[in-house]
């Protein structure tokens, strides 16, 4: 009998090629190496004090063995000391913090801990695409509520804060099956920071309907405007919010895969239980290195210099967009910006591959700019449902977590677009 293959789970069988695979494949096929402003990883090393901490940790005997399933005590203590002032309470490192294998495993652990089949999770569009698979693999049902772009965003630069959550749709999206809401602030891909007014409206609904919130705050150290945490708005909210953080985003070491969850003991104990079954423990030397890094960051004035350098990085792209008269979002936080290419005229009969030709216009923009201009970006309709994708089909997402030289070269190459307006 001929071998017919093993059928995959329905959880993955229906998956179409994701945007990361498509962009990476197209990038690899380029004759001239493109400048990559696509994925949100850094193309330079973490600061020396962070690297020194990692080198020191790898020589420690205990750091080469399993850590406590909830995370190394040194890192949980460092996180408590670093975040207690922001949460306006003393965070218990033993019961209110758990270290995870990157922020993504943190999300997965919360969904695994609290979702039953058919439970609904409200997700705001555009969304980080990993949310969706994490929800559905744990039996949840995503329900989408759009963040609406400002009308003037297609003709001039606008603040990311001008993109507004449709509160009426959020209210109407809540049903008896709703279990959770996912919030991302500072937002990927918009760079939006939700205002205190917006968060209070969300808080009213959370308390009224007894909902759990997963608050993705992995870019919290890159906030260029006042940053408010939902969990701190009212004392009772702490028991409704699990906050997700990232060592990789905070210190420029995304490959270390160390994240964390912060929340009330009643939430963390179940998330920690799921985390233990998913990966048992997180790599020890990188945890210890981050514990040291948190302790030394203020001494090196790291956070202020981090923000200052990213404002300068964004200014390189903003200047290039201004020269091209391309509208863009001015981020409130994070290291992403969205630029609007509605005026760019794609050549007729361009040979787009089938997997690109059948997708919205931003995929074609992304592919063409990659192949002809040599700059890699991300098409943001990947972060929307098919129904709402037209909202973003003229935009591209740029990640500016790159060296100044990389950004300057990207800006130079982008000037070639003048011939296509």
From Swiss-Prot:
Keyword set, alphabetical order: Aminotransferase, Cytoplasm, Pyridoxal phosphate, Transferase
Cofactors, names only: pyridoxal 5'-phosphate
Origin: domain of life: Eukaryota
Family matches, as SUPFAM superfamilies: PLP-dependent transferases
Enzyme Commission designation: 2.6.1.-
One of the GO BP terms on file: amino acid metabolic process
CDD domains assigned: AAT_like (cd00609)
An annotated Gene Ontology molecular function: 2-aminoadipate transaminase activity
Location(s), subcellular: Cytoplasm
Main localization, broad class: cytoplasm
Family classification: Belongs to the class-I pyridoxal-phosphate-dependent aminotransferase family.
Record protein name field: Uncharacterized aminotransferase C6B12.04c
Organism: Schizosaccharomyces pombe (strain 972 / ATCC 24843)
Lineage, uppermost ranks: Eukaryota, Fungi, Dikarya, Ascomycota, Taphrinomycotina
